[in-house]
Amino acid sequence: MVSTEDFDYNLPEELIAQTPMIERAASRLLVMDHETGALEDKVFYDIIDELNPGDAVVMNNTRVLPARLYGVKPDTGGHEEVLLLNNTHDDEWEVLMKPAKRAKVGTEVVFGDGQLRAIVTKELEHGGRMIEFKYDGIFMQILEALGEMPLPPYIKEKLDDPEMYQTVYAKEPGSAAAPTAGFHWTEELLQKVQDKGIKLVYLTLHVGLGTFRPVSEDNVEDHKMHSEFYRLTEEAAATLNEVKQNGGRIVATGTTSIRTLETIATKFDGEIKADSGWTEIFIKPGYQWKAVDAFITNFHLPKSTLVMLVASFTGRENILNAYQHAVDERYRFFSFGDAMFVK
């Protein structure tokens, strides 16, 4: 049995980054050799030295929705907070509602001055709800006007500029949380990467809030993964296959890029093909990696599936040792924190 406790570590609260770096690429970078566990302290700008001509850097171009809405129930005047999780079909969404116990099937909630309304259509097992939106106009424009950016619960500070909770290449709206390893990239640094003969490849995975959920079950096998929508285009798949054939490495930016590529490679017997769908892949120790050769990732929450994902590539001892080093050296942790490059 793989125990959840095996992926716990002690993190002083003051190391949880509360604000983004003004200069994105000035964050620190802990470089790790996944076989030996050897560590090097660098700055994210130095990532260019870690990449070779002929490699491909893969990034998730999802855009975070202003997914938190505050509304009123017209029949009682009661307040409801609605957090969008997944757009399952047309105007139907899977959401979390607070207070949930008052959100029965048929409950109506009105947002703003009434330009957006929602009806609860179903109660879900995990406490969530299915709702259907009614509105006049373009949904995304209304959401941009009424919604708030849903920052992770461990970030207590208000964000001055919501764009700092997006990557510089975010363009496909649909996430409830950002693919945070991508925060460190700047347009200037990506240009330098390209100039060095490295391919830039974009895919889409819409990040759900399950990303932040610690594993509550003692036995890792009992944990149920959340489902997330992904897409890889023909063009992106062709570039990645060409890179692989020519001996280059596929370098994933973040766990969302990893999960997309490994989902596809698992589905097609190790091959990378254009594909879209929903993934519940749980990458944990014992998993055989099929597509990704190296990756950039932030420092993740204790006992989270993301620590387990990294451990499946590096070995548990190596990753816990790296995290202890990061704590000792006062690295910044979680969404707005520093990065690792695992090779």
Curated annotation (Swiss-Prot):
Assembly and binders: Monomer.
Top EC category: transferase
Protein encoded by which gene: queA
Pfam families linked to this entry: Queuosine_synth (PF02547)
Function: Transfers and isomerizes the ribose moiety from AdoMet to the 7-aminomethyl group of 7-deazaguanine (preQ1-tRNA) to give epoxyqueuosine (oQ-tRNA).
Family assignment from sequence similarity: Belongs to the QueA family.
Cited Gene3D superfamilies: QueA-like
Reaction equations catalysed: 7-aminomethyl-7-carbaguanosine(34) in tRNA + S-adenosyl-L-methionine = epoxyqueuosine(34) in tRNA + adenine + L-methionine + 2 H(+)
Signal peptide positions on this chain: none
Organism superkingdom: Bacteria
Protein name: S-adenosylmethionine:tRNA ribosyltransferase-isomerase
Subcellular location(s) per record: Cytoplasm
One GO cellular component term: cytoplasm
An example molecular function term from Gene Ontology annotations: S-adenosylmethionine:tRNA ribosyltransferase-isomerase activity
EC number: 2.4.99.17
Gene Ontology BP term (one): tRNA wobble guanine modification
UniProt pathway: tRNA modification; tRNA-queuosine biosynthesis
Record key words, sorted: Cytoplasm, Queuosine biosynthesis, S-adenosyl-L-methionine, Transferase
